[in-house]
Amino acid sequence: MLFRSAESYEDRYGVDFEVAVPTAEDTLPIVLRSNLFRVVQEAASNALRHGNAKKISVHCSYGDGELSLKIEDDGVGFDVDKVKTKSAERRSFGLSNMEERIRFMNGTFSIDSQPGQGTRIRITVPMEGDS
């Protein structure tokens, strides 16, 4: 799913979209796979629409019973606290939906961004679960 999505973004938007996943995605539990796909999709959409990113990278690793995912872009960046406040006021829930999806799976979600420095999202999710 992620590889096809990356190819689609490269073709449609001319962005360099790098995906590094150490094993076949279809071996992951369906709930985990689906939620991670939606989070990556939202992050990529935000990077293109708001950040004017030219490069997006998604790196996934497994170890110690958990999956770690890092999504980075070279876009314009933003003040995270300010955007979260404005998003709540405008009832725009992209960032909060990403975070909720990860917390639903007992994971952790962090976002780091500053104007002029791109955006980095880090996710950790336990690997247990039903497929």
Each language-model region and where it sits:
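Coiled-coil dimerization/phosphotransfer module
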Residues: M1-S131
